Amino acid sequence: IIETNNVIYAISTGSNFDLNTLKKAAKTNNFPIPKKNKKNFFQLKGARRLFPWQTPRRRNPRELHELIKDPDAAKKIIIPVDIFWGKSPDRQDHWVKLIFRDSWEGSSFLRNLLKVIFNGRQANVFFHKPLESEEIFTQKKSSSHLVLKTDRLLRARFRRNRQAKLGPDISNRRTLIHSILNSSSVKKEISNFSKGSKKVEAAQNKRAYKYALEICSDISYPVIYLYDKALNWFWNNRYDGLEIIGIEKISDLAVGNSLIYTPSHRSHIDYLALSFKLYTNNLMLPQIVAGKNLNLPVLGRILRNGGAFFMRRSFGANKLYSKVFFEHLRKLFQRGYSIEFFPEGGRTRTGRLLSPRPGIISMIIKSFQDMDERDVKFLPISITYEKVLEGKSYLRESKRRIKEKESIFSIFSTISDFRGYLGNAYLQFGEPIDCLLYTSPSPRDALT
């Protein structure tokens, strides 16, 4: 296909660096070289502005308008092309390269220049499945309508391809929060409570925004890179590694399914154990449900950057918080993310499993019940240790018969307790549970 004269390249960005990289790749592979005088390419965005805070112009390119008006337009083959700078986060060999790799965040000219400087030898050009012009010209519509249709088809194609490479886009936390606050359920709850009062409505909107900030994660790949280095040292120096059993089944399940990981909970390190192993096995990092008691100074930011989002122990009669939290779960499922939560609710102090708490399970089931695009699988996981980090604090609690309150000082005192060798650690995946088999009548009946 690409050797014919009917090829039109569609580039997702307006970057001249990307265009020149495509020209070089085309020349190397004896493909048609994109040239302005041949009118065989177009870019969906205008040129990047100089500074990061300036947004690029979204536009329908002049070349696309000319293509639509061409009498032979139906014979043309539009090939979407993506250019990614830098290797995936788990394969980067330097933190500077990681910072300037491609992500969902926008790029300025300066950032693009730095990407070329630090990742110039790691540029990857992807020629995607062609967009057949016959898909566009089957209906007799105006040229402006056909331009918009082509633009939408290409942007959807680029977004799917980018998600396959980078994972779902929740890097822009403000966008996620904005979508939660503008959801129909949150708006309806605010409207019902306000009863027409603009002053009350404004106050409720502020409350909802505060709740969303409190809940949402803020994944940072530079921080995850540091996690990887620190946890790799930890598991191999304080434990005799972290042995994983059954990971091979996860790779197949991750395709076309939303996965809900449900590990046992014996130690604070559980929050990062599963993510560490998924990361090292090139699987998507989950969003982790963490108790609000862990949203402490320093620690809360570290956990949030690793994918944790925070949940209050009890919602009580706070309907607005409940709506915001529920919508957050829905948005995560809609964007294709997996979830990790601890069914026991808290850490076991005795080593025995605690009875599961049905509240979060019920909310998770309810949040994906009306979504038909993906199947949902629960994955039970056992995380066991020969010795746990919190061994000494558990002994103190058993003697006093009082549970110690979480604080940043208690966390660091726990860390200071594990100077010695802690033995072996194991992470084992159980058999997946298909939610569709249990959620037909209603979530509550299924849980019972």
Predicted regions and their residues:
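Short, flexible loop segments at the rims of nucleotide/cofactor-binding pockets, characterized by
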Residues: 235-241, 288, 315-320
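Short conserved beta-strand segments at catalytic cores or DNA/RNA-binding microdomains
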Residues: 25, 41-44, 277-278
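Membrane-anchoring hydrophobic helices of lipid-metabolizing enzymes
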Residues: 1-28, 160-260, 265-276, 300-307, ...
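A cross-family acyltransferase "interaction/gating" segment
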Residues: 2-3, 11-12, 19-20, 30-141, ...
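Short acidic-hydrophobic, aromatic-tinged amphipathic segments that line or gate anion-handling sites
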Residues: 311-312
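Single conserved hydrophobic/aromatic residue that forms the stacking wall/gate
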Residues: 438-448
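Non-catalytic terminal/interface segments that mediate subunit docking, oligomerization
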Residues: 261-265, 282, 288-291
